[in-house]
Every structure is written in C-alpha cells, then in structure tokens.
A protein has these predicted regions:
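Metal-dependent de-N-acetylase/amidase catalytic core
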Residues: 1-117
Length: 117
C-alpha cells in the first residue's frame, strides 16, 4: 500500500488497506503488509509533524531495474522529465540510493507495517 503522504488519494488507499487487512478473523492469509515509497509525494510530508518515509526493509531489485524503469515510463502523465522527482533518472537514482543502504546495486525501500511469522 502507499505510505501515507501528501496525496489525498494515497491517504485514502492507505486507510482502506489498513481497514481491509486487519488480522481480526481466523484464517487471515495476509502474511506481510508493507508500505512503499512514492516518488514526488513521500518526501513532502512536514518534518517533525508528520511521519516521513523511512524504510525498514530494502529489497534487491538489481535484476529488475530495467523492467521497473520501462514500466514506469508507461505512465506518461506521471513523468516529470527531464530532472523532476518523477523522471526515469530520479527513479534510478532512488533505487541506487536505497540499494546502497543495504549493499545492493539497486534496491526498493518498504516500511513493514505488519508481518506474520
């Protein structure tokens, strides 16, 4: 689910996912619930007032980075070229940064909300 950021639609989706995924019934099959980082939205939360995205789990996406960039470029209305936070360059840079935090060439950060072990 999206991390609760400035985008009102992302906040609504986050709240809906939190309600729909409550582990209150027997046999709940959701083993992992994690929030993802959203380029150009997650970093706009007000510092020290609202929670800012801090990943506590980074997945190695080195083998998938080119596919991720290609998929991202399919959403033309969401791209801010050439140097915006929603550019292919920024997506790649964020993957390099998140990967460097965990020893991968490219990584994608998540914040684990709930995990059943």
């Amino acid at each position: 689910c999206p991390y609760p950021d400035r985008h009102i639609d992302h906040q609504a989706v986050f709240q809906a996912v939190m309600v729909a995924s409550r582990p209150v019934r027997a046999g709940s099959d959701i083993e992992l619930l994690a929030a993802y980082e959203t380029p150009s939205e997650t970093q706009w939360n007000a510092p020290h007032i609202e929670p800012n995205f801090t990943p506590n789990w980074v997945v190695d996406i080195s083998d998938q980075i080119e596919t991720k960039i290609e998929a991202f470029q399919c959403f033309e209305s969401q791209i801010s070229e050439p140097y915006g936070s929603r550019s292919a360059e920024a997506v790649r840079a964020m993957a390099i940064f998140r990967g460097s935090q965990s020893g991968f060439p490219y990584g994608e950060g998540f914040h684990v909300i709930r995990m059943r072990t």
